[in-house]
A protein has these predicted regions:
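A well-ordered secondary-structure block
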Residues: 38-56, 158-234
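Intrinsic-disorder/low-complexity regions
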Residues: 3, 25-27, 147-149, 165, ...
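Generic detector of short, well-ordered, non-transmembrane alpha-helical segments enriched
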Residues: 35, 110, 128, 221-222
Length: 234
């Protein structure tokens, strides 16, 4: 899977859950399915269409309408519904219930966008969570992150093999994002609300042109360069 833009990151379980690791086993009937959560949402602005996303993925050319819609999407989607859970958690040692909570939160965002384009919702599966764990552990154990030149393909392949997936097809499983370092959060500790806020921003980035920059740069068209992640999620 070609990746033109690297998103912010220090790898964590939450980061893996925000991308392809959630979806890799989506059609595997051998995994257990839980209810889909539809709490948090992202609104797709007018001009953000399925045909525009397909066209970019086929030609690499974005229409002005798609770029403008992506700008609007980044600026107007500001309510993450992350709540006020200020309990600190170690992102490298999340409990299973915390992983499930973050997974379902992420799925609610992705599904809100899919549904607006007439696509079916994805559902949470334990097998996908196990795969996400294995991918995240490969990054963590081998001191890799999204700051590297590309995805950690050998680790992803090992995780795929351990999960009973095809490990010979290369990097087709992961869309990655992660956690920035800030003055408030500069260790592995985050609040659950902070994690959800970051996942919300990361999913917005993936949907809206791979936006890279600060709030003051959201009107800069040059900051919107790829919709491959959007094609993966949608």
């Amino acid at each position: 899977m070609r990746k033109n833009v690297k998103l912010l990151s220090t790898i964590s379980i939450a980061a893996a859950l925000a991308g392809g690791a959630v979806t890799a086993l989506n059609n595997d009937s051998s995994t257990s399915t839980f209810s889909t959560v539809e709490a948090a949402s992202i609104t797709l602005p007018s001009g953000y269409t399925k045909s525009a996303i397909i066209k970019w993925n086929q030609t690499g050319k974005a229409s002005k309408a798609l770029i403008n819609a992506s700008k609007k999407g980044m600026k107007e989607n500001i309510n993450s519904e992350a709540g006020n859970d200020n309990s600190l958690v170690n992102v490298t040692k999340l409990t299973n219930s915390q992983k499930v909570e973050l997974s379902k939160y992420t799925l609610s965002l992705i599904n809100s966008a899919r549904n607006q384009l007439g696509k079916q919702s994805w559902t949470y599966k334990t097998g996908a969570l196990h795969f996400a764990d294995r991918v995240a552990n490969q990054y963590y154990d081998h001191d890799r992150s999204c700051w590297d030149a590309d995805h950690y393909v050998p680790g992803i392949e090992r995780a795929a093999k351990a999960s009973g997936l095809n490990s010979r097809v290369g990097q087709v499983y992961e869309d990655e994002a992660g956690l920035p370092i800030s003055s408030e959060f500069h260790t592995n500790m985050r609040t659950m609300s902070a994690l959800k806020n970051q996942i919300y921003f990361n999913v917005k980035q993936m949907l809206f042109g791979g936006f890279s920059g600060s709030d003051s740069q959201m009107n800069d068209s040059s900051r919107y360069t790829e919709w491959e992640h959007a094609g993966d999620l949608l």
